[in-house]
Design a protein with these regions (language model features):
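Membrane-embedded alpha-helical segments of integral membrane proteins
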Residues: 13-76
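C-terminal/domain-edge helix-coil "capping" segments
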Residues: 67, 92-126, 227-306, 310-311
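Short beta-strand->alpha-helix linker/helix-N-cap micro-motif
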Residues: 111-220, 224-240, 269-275
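TPR alpha-solenoid repeat register
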Residues: 317, 351, 387, 421, ...
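Canonical tetratricopeptide repeat
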Residues: 320, 354-356, 390, 424, ...
Length: 770
């Protein structure tokens, strides 16, 4: 009887296969050591494992045919079997590793730094970077005195990770800091943490708990996979004090993520105290300030002030303090804090140094140098997607949309997991009038984030701006289905109702949204939309009341400077309702209150008020300052506004032929989506004013075409209806003119008595009717 086991032993198959497995294991260990030591692609280890296992049948076949003592012939069947195994192995390896980098995990980059020195840097390739969302740790010590560490510990780890280009510790969309206080942050369940991590494009997320021990402090670190929501690793980490614990957690996390050991050993890794402060008295208010940034900027500023009083070398606290002082209308003091941060920038890792210099040049009125610094960062770190995002934001604000689009596309190409960049790409294509590319970007964004409302909101907003209101409504409705408790989809539905002139539906939607408000940011959006609805109806007094509520929230969320700017710009609303004295008083307050670098925007507010009062001379007097302001702020994206105001001054002086090119510049494709945004501070969009000038010049067909464009996108726009009435009257269509006026006056049925546009429409109707 045939004994297969004995035959295997006679042919020495177990010995040969065992030797192959042992040799393969040695090769695998050597490969793993080499990958870690020389920072090679981790895919190389997987490649060796796959090759090792796929060739096992060939080794077994050779052992069976040639393992027995004596000479053996090499058969045709054996050759075919070996060839088939080899072909199969090659095909499997090709399918598994096609497109994967099996070389070095880093690339060398040579650039010239700001001192003119040639610098060579080794930067990780995007494929091997890790994005980690860090959530607050739970205090299980039973000691309330340690509650502040719940938020602080996660933030300290995030700051420490900034030293390693292989790992990006990302925030949590400020959701943790929108309620509670610095010592009692929101502690989300794992399911909610997973959702937030996915929104932030983080492949993994980290949370945990800590407790006090006789020897110091101990934390249980939990690392989860975002896609599956499963626990990947759980570690116990301990240290003598909280900041040392943050260092230990950071190191443990890097190793668990698979950052090559050779890279870890060669990378500077300062203790997190060196990146922050040696003073415990400075650390606690600093972390409190970080927590308060999203909800109470004045409280945050006071916390950072306390931190720098305790340690003036605390560069990161100085940097935040500088930003907040500038936003608090304390420009000179803000620059001093930023300069103090630059003197002690040795406490910052390189990425933060670039951010500091960019902010310093932006605040000090040198926007071009800010862009230069941001561009230098992308040259030093050409594989750093976040650097390209920073550059893209600055370029977009400067008005260089093509360069901004290229920078965003570079960022997405470097890290395809950052799907949120697709919204920015879609917005830029939309503002350029490229509908096909815009929709392609938005739909890809939706495909990658099928569970969230944000992509649906993005597409709905696009269709809203392009006048496709049915499509906009459908996407806002879909967003509501995905997130029923989120007020933003309701805001979108209200906007659609206002665009269509359905004021009652808009009011009902606002009432529904009011019951859903969760955060101060939600409330700000609500009051701004409520103000737009009231302004559309000509209830400017109510609109001003909404603006005051929004301004109070803006002061809380963004600081006094932002609030004072909003308060000053509400002066144009006061002028529109016939209250010139209130408008002047608001401008006087703005002039007396705003400090550099914001004081120069007073000229813009004055011009907007003058436009409402038909004061062409004041507009023209303000124009040089406005154009200089836009250059100084690097705000090329708002250059159209200066053209619009100049065109308005020419129209008021009956110089319409000179105004036409300026109106065309102010209403071209790059700003169309903005113009159809129900920006009621403007009163009427440039296309309507452009049409008015064409009508005066007798170019009725062109005027009609422009007004048709406006009303096809915003059917409920009463200003355009009034201008269309004037056009029809000029063409002898009295009945058509009266019908358009009736539609506008129906919108303004409850307008304030002093509301000037409604009064002018009534006067025109009386004239035509008689």
């Amino acid at each position: 009887m045939f004994d297969f086991g004995k035959e295997l032993m006679r042919r020495r198959v177990p010995q040969i296969v065992g030797a192959y497995l042992a040799g393969g294991w040695i090769l695998l260990e050597f490969t793993d050591w080499t990958v870690n030591r020389y920072v090679l692609s981790p895919h190389l280890t997987d490649f060796v494992v796959a090759s090792w296992l796929l060739l096992l049948p060939a080794v077994a076949m050779i052992a069976w045919n040639h393992g027995q003592p004596g000479r053996d012939a090499f058969t045709r069947a054996e050759a075919i079997g070996l060839a088939l195994n080899l072909v199969f192995a090659v095909l499997v390896l090709f399918s598994m590793f096609r497109g994967r980098d099996l070389g070095a995990a880093t690339s060398a980059v040579r650039v010239t730094d700001e001192q003119g020195r040639t610098v060579t840097r080794s930067v990780p390739k995007p494929e091997f970077r890790h994005r980690v969302a860090l959530f607050s740790f739970r205090n299980e010590s039973g000691d309330p005195a340690l509650d502040w560490l719940q938020f602080a510990l996660a933030q300290a780890v995030r700051i420490d990770l900034r030293q390693d280009a292989f790992v990006a510790g990302v925030g949590t969309s400020n959701r943790e800091t929108q309620s509670g206080d610095p010592e009692h942050p929101l502690l989300f369940p794992i399911a909610r943490q997973r959702e937030i991590a996915a929104e932030r494009d983080a492949g993994v997320f980290v949370t945990g708990r800590f407790r006090e021990m006789p020897s110091g402090i101990e934390a249980r670190l939990e690392l989860y996979d975002t896609h599956r929501g499963t626990l990947r690793t759980e570690r116990i980490v301990s240290a003598a004090d909280p900041m040392q614990l943050a260092d230990s957690i950071s190191m443990r996390l890097r190793r668990d993520l698979g950052v090559p050991g050779g890279h870890i050993d060669a990378t500077p890794d300062l203790p997190v105290r060196e990146l922050l402060s040696e003073s415990d008295a400075a650390l606690r208010p600093f972390f409190a300030g970080l927590f308060l940034l999203a909800s109470e900027v004045e409280e945050a500023k006071r916390s950072f002030e306390q931190a720098v009083r305790e340690d003036s070398t605390f560069a990161r606290a100085q940097m935040w303090l500088g930003n907040l002082r500038v936003s608090s209308n304390e420009g000179a003091e803000g620059l001093q804090a930023l300069e103090a941060a630059m003197r002690h920038e040795y406490r910052l890792e390189e990425a933060s140094r670039f951010l500091l210099r960019t902010e310093y040049f932006r605040v000090s009125g040198e926007p071009e140098r800010a862009i230069d610094v941001a561009r230098m960062r992308t040259e030093l770190y050409p594989d750093d997607g976040e650097g390209f995002e920073t550059l893209a934001r600055l370029l977009r604000w400067s008005g260089d949309d093509p360069a901004a689009l290229a920078a965003y596309e570079s960022a997405l190409g470097l890290d395809p997991s950052r799907s949120s960049i697709l919204r920015q790409i879609g917005d830029l294509h939309a503002s350029a009038g490229d509908e096909e590319e815009a929709l392609r970007a938005y739909r890809e964004y939706t495909r990658r984030n099928a569970e969230g409302a944000e992509p649906e909101l993005a597409i709905g907003t696009y269709f809203l701006g392009s006048g496709e209101l049915d499509s906009a409504s459908a996407h806002f409705d879909r967003a509501r289905l995905l997130e029923p408790s989120n007020p933003e989809p309701v805001f979108g539905e209200v906007s659609v109702a206002l665009y269509e002139g359905r004021l009652a539906d808009g009011e009902a939607g606002l009432a529904r949204a009011a019951r859903m408000l969760r955060t101060a940011r939600d409330s700000l959006g609500y009051f701004e939309l409520e103000g737009q609805a009231r302004e559309l109806a000509g209830r400017t007094g109510g609109s001003l009341a909404s603006a005051r509520n929004a301004i109070l929230l803006r002061e809380r969320l963004e600081g006094p400077a932002s609030a004072e700017q909003a308060r000053g710009f509400s002066a144009s609303q006061a002028a529109r309702m016939g209250s010139e004295d209130e408008a002047r008083a608001l401008l006087d307050t703005m002039t007396a209150t705003l400090q550099p670098p914001f004081d120069d925007i007073v000229s813009l507010a004055e011009a907007l008020v003058a436009r409402e009062l038909d004061d062409a001379a004041t507009i023209r007097r303000s124009l040089p300052e406005i154009r200089q302001l836009l250059v100084a702020k690097g705000a090329g994206s708002l250059a159209w506004l200066a053209d619009f105001l100049e065109a308005e001054s020419l129209r008021l002086e009956n110089r319409c032929s000179e105004a036409l090119p300026l109106y065309a510049s102010a209403s071209g494709p790059p700003v169309r989506s903005y113009l159809f945004g129900l920006n009621r501070e403007m009163g009427a969009d440039p296309l309507t004013r452009h049409a008015a000038c064409l009508r005066r010049l007798g170019r009725h067909d062109e005027a009609s075409e422009l007004l048709a464009t406006v009303l096809s996108r915003v059917p409920g726009e009463p200003h355009a209806r009034v201008e269309l009435a004037r056009l029809k009257a000029a063409r002898g269509d009295r009945e058509g003119a009266l019908a358009e006026l009736d539609r506008a006056l129906a919108t303004w049925a409850e307008a304030d008595r002093g509301y000037r546009p409604a009064a002018a429409a009534r006067a025109l109707r009386t004239e035509l009717a008689s």
